[in-house]
Amino acid sequence: MVKVSNLGYPRLGEQREWKQAIEAFWAGNLEQKDLEKQLKQLRINHLKKQKEAGIDLIPVGDFSCYDHVLDLSFQFNVIPKRFDEYERNLDLYFAIARGDKDNVASSMKKWFNTNYHYIVPEWEVETKPHLQNNYLLDLYLEAREVVGDKAKPVITGPITYVSLSSGIVDFEATVQRLLPLYKQVFQDLIDAGATYIQIDEPIFVTDEGELLVDIAKSVYDFFAREVPQAHFIFQTYFESAVCLDKLSKLPVTGFGLDFIHGRAENLAAVKQGLFREKELFAGIVNGRNIWAVNLEETLALLEEIGPFVKRLTLQPSSSLLHVPVTTKYETHLDPVLKNGLSFADEKLKELELLASAFDGNKTKGYHEALSRFSALQAADFRHVALESLAEVKLERSPYKLRQALQAEKLQLPILPTTTIGSFPQSPEIRKKRLAWKRGNLSDSDYKDFIKTEIRRWIAIQEDLDLDVLVHGEFERVDMVEFFGQKLAGFTTTKLGWVQSYGSRAVKPPIIYGDVKHIQPLSLEETVYAQSLTKKPVKGMLTGPITITNWSFERDDISRSDLFNQIALAIKDEIQLLEQSGIAIIQVDEAALREGLPLRQQKQQAYLDDAVAAFKIATSSVKDETQIHTHMCYSKFDEIIDSIRALDADVISIETSRSHGDIIESFETAVYPLGIGLGVYDIHSPRIPTKEEIIVNIQRSLKCLSKEQFWVNPDCGLKTRREAETIAALEVLVSATKEVRQQLDN
């Protein structure tokens, strides 16, 4: 019989119990022993669920208190020297992730091309890796008590781990330093009864992976020689694996391949017979989107694969970390739509149905699922209606002309100060929103409350003497879901939460049909804010690429068509804002780079589509209307030509946690437009010093002119507390004024 495996399960819990427990601990409202007790119960619940769903190999080690990469750094003592004062305990673990009053947090980067963030391991001259504790063994022993020999340890492999690290001087030597530690972890697991061990090596779906194949042979020869009893699974995901003709010869029991995002290439490798002597762990249910699987199409794929492998195991294409837990609470949705959704729990059921069907037993549940899938495909809300683009202006006047007109209209000082858009959402704001959603607060009372918050924060910004203000986005849960509630073709879930970083969870909207602008999105709040001040207030919108990348997108049309549908809707809102007197409009593309394909050969087509969609949205404005955009953590040197091609008058970029690395992109490339490189890290509660911000501004001014540089935090301030926000912005404004004075002198 074919087996079913899982790569990873969501940490959050059905009701976000994980998030609530960790944040209660941070706030001092939960003792560590109680936190550990609650997290253990969550882990056990997750294990039991997967066992009951019929999963034969259940992941252990996918659960974390913050991030699985940080877990490995902590286990191997790869800890920055600045945290030496700490004992090796949970306080240190969270300090590395979040920073403290004296130390900046470690950098945070996107996990490949997802919206999950990992904590970057920092290697220094002083780093002395050793096995601080075998936490994976502890988790395995715990899991065996619940699921027996179904427990399958999961660990990020050494080559991927080092590839994701900073401060590496000698790559191969660093990998070699870790091998004895991995060996000990593996041997302890085998001694405790483990058989299969999943080693995640997703770096081998990237172009970089092609350069690491020889190192992989050395590493996995070592593992096979030193821990011969282990059944290692070399796991890849998010794309087709590179160099499979060579990797397939590694001395491992099985290979995990993604047949959703790398189907053609991986299938071709299988049909070449590369895995005839291997177990194949086939990722055939999408671990990153929420649509029910096409059972018949997938069964046909399995029948293609089957004859070419020694043994076949079915699994999701990636960890289910990237999807919500269950659809069972989404009773408000149209039944056809709800029945066409598949979150983590439903995906496990789909795998069971496929395994049974592949073994020759198409159950009643199989036929019912097939019927639900067909009903969604036939639904009348899916037409691919794309308005004609013939009348849409795609180019603006030259930047120098626009810059002069905007300078005359706005009358801003050099080094203008602003924020990215959102301000803290206090418990009171959340309480009012919840009361309104439950019908316990009238629409008018809720709007009045939002206006009160806008009025209060406009006054705070004026007191701080910021130059360009924002309304604060108090009406928004997040920068994508809010738009999903107002555009046709979107819907939102009640509990469709997904982890983004640490305890931060997002609830991506679902794009299920044709997207259209049917009502104002942010007009009322923005116009009200502008009526309270003579300073310019930015209109705040999210761009088409970010809306797509941070939504669960429909999978029945091309991404370029979807980008353009959303761009036309955003264009309509921009025109409303401009007609209402809003002189600066920010169209955030925070996730533009996040959606970049992992393979270079596929990247330019995506970037071309992204630039075209941004221009559809923004190019119809008058020359004196200033278009801003904002982008999050990224390697910008790789896409700087496309950033320039967006032709935004001002771009702000998250840079503080990269410790200046992004600035190097602009030291080697001419960037002619306005730009703000974030001068302090908003992801940490730590208040920056005036000297730090001055240094960041001065370094930026070495490669950017004072006429083009803006001063801003590196991201929105929604997750910070009010006192922290005001204190940090006071420092930002004071530092900027001092630099202005230096420039004047």
Curated annotation (Swiss-Prot):
Q: Which residues form the active site?
A: H683
Which top class of enzyme applies to this chain? transferase
Which biological processes are named by the entry's GO terms?
A: methionine biosynthetic process; methylation
Binding-site residues for L-homocysteine, renumbered to this chain: I420, G421, S422, E473, D588
Source domain of life is Bacteria
Q: Pfam families under this entry?
A: Meth_synt_1 (PF08267), Meth_synt_2 (PF01717)
Catalytic reaction list: 5-methyltetrahydropteroyltri-L-glutamate + L-homocysteine = tetrahydropteroyltri-L-glutamate + L-methionine
- Write out the residues that bind L-methionine: I420, G421, S422, E473, D588
Could you list this entry's UniProt keywords, alphabetically sorted. Amino-acid biosynthesis, Metal-binding, Methionine biosynthesis, Methyltransferase, Repeat, Transferase, Zinc
Cofactor binding: number and manner? Binds 1 zinc ion per subunit.
Binding residues for 5-methyltetrahydropteroyltri-L-glutamate, per the UniProt record? Answer: R16, E17, W18, K19, K110, W550, E594
In terms of Gene3D superfamilies, this protein maps to: 3.20.20.210
EC number(s): the record gives: 2.1.1.14
Report a single Gene Ontology molecular function. 5-methyltetrahydropteroyltriglutamate-homocysteine S-methyltransferase activity
Q: Where does Zn(2+) bind?
A: H630, C632, E654, C715
Pathway annotation: Amino-acid biosynthesis; L-methionine biosynthesis via de novo pathway; L-methionine from L-homocysteine (MetE route): step 1/1
Q: Return the CDD domains for the record.
A: CIMS_C_terminal_like, CIMS_N_terminal_like
Which PANTHER family does the UniProt record give?
A: 5-METHYLTETRAHYDROPTEROYLTRIGLUTAMATE--HOMOCYSTEINE METHYLTRANSFERASE (PTHR30519)
Tell me its family. Belongs to the vitamin-B12 independent methionine synthase family.
* Annotated function: Catalyzes the transfer of a methyl group from 5-methyltetrahydrofolate to homocysteine resulting in methionine formation.
For this entry, the protein name equals 5-methyltetrahydropteroyltriglutamate--homocysteine methyltransferase
Organism equals Streptococcus agalactiae serotype V (strain ATCC BAA-611 / 2603 V/R)
Organism classification, top ranks?
Answer: Bacteria, Bacillati, Bacillota, Bacilli, Lactobacillales
